[in-house]
Regions:
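C-terminal beta-strand-loop-alpha-helix "lid" module of Rossmann-like NAD(P)-dependent dehydrogenases
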Residues: 1-204
């Protein structure tokens, strides 16, 4: 689950935590499921239970956004691929906020492993091609790169969504504070006017 390190961003983090808990209680209930938390908020939510998991040897995943680089994302992606190839896990999904615009984010549950091949609709004629290097070598090289890019994209999407959610939340907070200030100023002026009127009546 990918969250942020900081709050003040509306329901950004709670939406991810709620989605993860929903999957643990639903689709993944009865399985030995582990949650790798990327971001401090997810780590705080799951470290107290038996689902939170910190991979060894790749650094603390919850600190990813302190230094978000492709290399750090690649380390985590490689760890997930190694665990899958070793048969230690059967399925990996990435849960993150997809950036739509500054005011809107969608919670995504994106399959990571195993890779599900897509089949194109309709018949398409393809000629015979000679691949150099071989098809196998190309696939073995491209798939890990593609998965690393997929994870990095999810992290970047989440990072952009965090800033958008925080900007929107702070804008609403500013508007609410302005409304409150206006209402309090009006109440103060009314009370002050009433006090002055009472003083004038007492003098008369």
């Amino acid at each position: 689950g990918i969250t942020s390190n900081r709050g003040l961003c509306g329901g950004f983090n709670n939406n991810i935590i709620k989605k993860v808990n929903g999957l643990l209680a639903g689709e993944f209930s009865g399985y030995n499921t582990k949650v790798i938390s990327v971001g401090k908020k997810a780590n705080d939510a799951f470290k107290r239970g038996d689902k939170g998991f910190r991979p060894e040897g790749i650094g603390a995943a919850e600190d990813m956004f302190n230094d978000l680089t492709f290399d750090r994302a690649s380390q985590l992606a490689q760890y997930l691929m190694d665990e899958f190839q070793a048969g230690k896990v059967d399925k990996v999904v990435i849960i993150y906020n997809k950036f739509i615009n500054a005011a809107s984010q969608d919670v995504m549950v994106e399959p990571f492993l195993p890779i599900i091949p897509t089949v194109s609709e309709g018949s398409s004629s393809t000629g015979d091609y000679i691949f150099e290097p071989s098809k196998t070598e190309i696939v073995e090289d491209m798939i890990p790169k593609s998965l690393k890019i997929q994870l990095f994209k999810g992290l970047l999407d989440s990072h952009a969504s965090e800033h958008g959610a925080r900007m929107t939340a702070m804008h609403k907070a500013t508007d609410n504070a302005s409304d409150l200030k206006r209402d309090l100023t009006l109440e103060y002026n009314k009370a002050r006017q009433a006090a002055i009127t009472n003083e004038i009546l007492e003098i008369v």
